[in-house]
Amino acid sequence: MAKIERKRIPNFTEPEDLTHQFIKMKDGRRMHVATVGSGEAIVFVHGWPEFWLTWMPLANKLKDDFKCIMPCLYGFGLSDKPNALRDDLNAEFHANDILQLVEKTCEKPPVLVGHDIGSHVLQCCATQGARKGSSLYPAGLIFFNCPTPSVGEEWISHGHINEIWYQSFHLTQLAVDLVGCSSETIKIYLEHFLRHWSFRKEAYEPFLSKLLETFSTKEAIYGGFSWYKSNNKARLKTIAGEKKPYNPKIKIPSSVLWGRHDPILRSNWASYLHENFENITIEFAEESGHFVHFEQPELAADFVRTKLNKWTQESG
């Protein structure tokens, strides 16, 4: 059981040595990437509604020992964005972008860290990398929540269907128009999820103004909502029990630190992880909800550092 961390406001401060760059994808799109620190590379993959800055409280605690690479997925933050809802921006699409980023910025296989959308992307990076025989196949995977195909009808059982209404709402142009109607509607909508999904309700507040700024355009709304439109077929197949555990299982060393109080990706779903991963350890953040990385950044940093040190020793 992970230790309980005292309440403190997370540090979203951008350090002086933080750098920003744009990486061009093979099709010409630009991916924005923020980088800080030096040492072994860690690539962080965010969720919705987030962008690279969501990782800063964690990166501030890791940057003295690790090179923290924090991209904005296509459609998010400062990366290029679509000008309409799209149905092809699924986990495979984003995983391909992350693998391109790794090839361009990492000298050896990095550890990937993710949650929410990022957890789907990391699983795809593992399966895609295995199929393609990538020379930069991830060295390890760290998750702060990790839904898998095995979750199945749990998505709609035990009242959970009431939590996932937004996933269908985001499929529509109506959602884009209503949410993006004004700066106030954007704030009301996004803050609802930040507050509802957090156990530490104050943790997101230092992040809020910059988050709202990045979601202030219709293109940014399209970008985020396109994930849900693109993932919808896979989501419905999962709920119907038509998606089976990975075969073969993901073999990369993996670890999960799941927020005990996550209301949308429930921590009891961790029981399905061993059906999909050959080598995975599971711990729980007892005072976190959905956003472990900024609700309990010290705990998250200790977790990342411990796992990387362990994997390095085992591989050496």
What function would you assign to each model-found segment?
Residues 63-72:
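Active-site machinery of serine-nucleophile hydrolases
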Residues 2-24, 29-31, 41, 49, ...:
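Flexible "cap/lid" subdomain of the alpha/beta-hydrolase fold that forms the substrate-access gate
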Residues 304-316:
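Short, hydrophobic alpha-helical segments
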Residues 57-61:
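Typically the conserved alpha-helix immediately C-terminal to a functionally engaged Cys/Sec
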Residues 33-35:
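Conserved hydrophobic "DFG−1" position in protein kinase catalytic cores
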